[in-house]
Regions:
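Compositionally biased terminal segments of proteins
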Residues: 1-138
Length: 138
């Protein structure tokens, strides 16, 4: 875990990537305008909300980024809004699911965040974690 330097580039470890690649993605249609004015249209797969959440939660085990915390809050707000466009259902609220594996690892990070002081994790994020992630005691 942590940053690795390969060549002249720094890379963070990517715990949770296996889950993100295993779950069905959300297909996003993109129309990009090029600098010459032409447009290119394509579809790109992005991780589903749950897979992205697990990635971001597990990223906190190797780095402490304000951006990751903002992304976690955004993903939880999406879950709270109950959108129809999930590629797969949100399962992190089920204690049977959060007992093991990458989802379990993410739930353990959530438990740490919930018990963090408000100066580290905002109250809204802690409330959303309590509401949407089943914390299983070991």
């Amino acid at each position: 875990p942590g940053k690795r330097i390969i060549g002249e580039r720094a890379f963070d470890g990517a715990p949770g990537l296996r889950l993100a690649l295993a779950l069905p993605p959300i297909e996003v249609a993109v129309t990009a305008r090029l600098t010459d004015g032409d447009t290119v249209e394509f579809e790109i797969p992005v991780p589903d909300v749950e897979a992205a959440f697990v990635l971001k939660m597990l990223a906190r085990t190797v780095r402490d980024s304000e951006r990751d915390l903002q992304d976690i809050e955004t993903l939880l707000e999406i879950v709270a809004s109950q959108p129809d466009y999930h590629a797969s259902p949100w399962r992190l609220g089920d204690p049977k699911i959060t007992k093991a594996g990458e989802r379990g690892d993410a739930a353990r990070v959530a438990a740490q965040m919930i018990s963090s002081p408000p100066t580290r994790v905002p109250a809204r994020v802690r409330a959303l974690l309590r509401r949407h992630v089943a914390i299983v005691s070991r």
